[in-house]
Amino acid sequence: MPPPHLHGTIAATLTKRTMSESTPATPQQYVQQKAASSGSSFYYAFLFLPAQKRAAITAFYAFCREVDDVVDEVMDPGVAQTKLAWWQNEVRQAFAGKPSHPVLQALMPHAPAFGIEQRHLMAVIEGCQMDLQQTRYLDFAGLQRYCHLVAGVVGEVSARIFGQTQPQTTDYAHQLGLALQLTNIIRDVGEDAMRGRIYLPISDLQHFGVKASAILAREYSPEFVELMRYQAQRAHQYYDKALALLPAADRRAQKPGLMMASIYRTLLREIEQENFQVLHQRISLTPLRKFWLAWKVQALGAHRI
């Protein structure tokens, strides 16, 4: 852990980001820049939303990016833990009416209207803390817990913002969040291995006869391909579960989530067609293709996801 005097320094640095010359003038501009610069597929799903919903989901997404970046960009685990602790305190302050970081200044005005609660934001931070505390998951149940925090809860909040009238839509959102996260894990196996991380359950590696050392060394084998095919089949099952759970009454409002399903499931199929060559490259869709997939859901519905 960093020495005590760094706690104040880190907090001051995080807060001062709102004052730096490179930071946009308003919280709304800050979160818009954060969302657009990430290059994420989520950005394309936001484009078709009405202004208030787009502002709310953009602010929430920017919050998720901020805390996730702590794990991805801070090399010292002790400093990263301190930053996440700062974020926990910042969330508490924000729900007490005193946000200081621009992402929460942008998000909090929307929280009452869309039912965004303190527990939602804390869960996202808890998921990032899990990333710092472990680099392996023994079984799928353990991985599910992680996915619940970093993706299921995100799906739940997103569904509330998009427009939810049926309780079952929460179940849909959690299943879809899990499907999206499993797709991310499949896509990023090689990148994660470079950072010493393996999200694929160890029990699955053992079942297919794949050594963790082979993944960390980014070595392909027929066993690895079979392991990844199994992971893809599991992800497809969760896409199917999610789509089956979405009530007809909420289907129109939940189009942004269905856009994400279309984009990510198309990516998953691309990875399958590439025979899971994910250890040495990051397979992705072009921005134009992502926009086209999002537009098709907006214009034609989600019958072929």
Language-model regions: role of each:
Residues 10, 14-182, 186, 190-305:
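Catalytic cores of Mg2+-dependent Asp-rich isoprenoid enzymes
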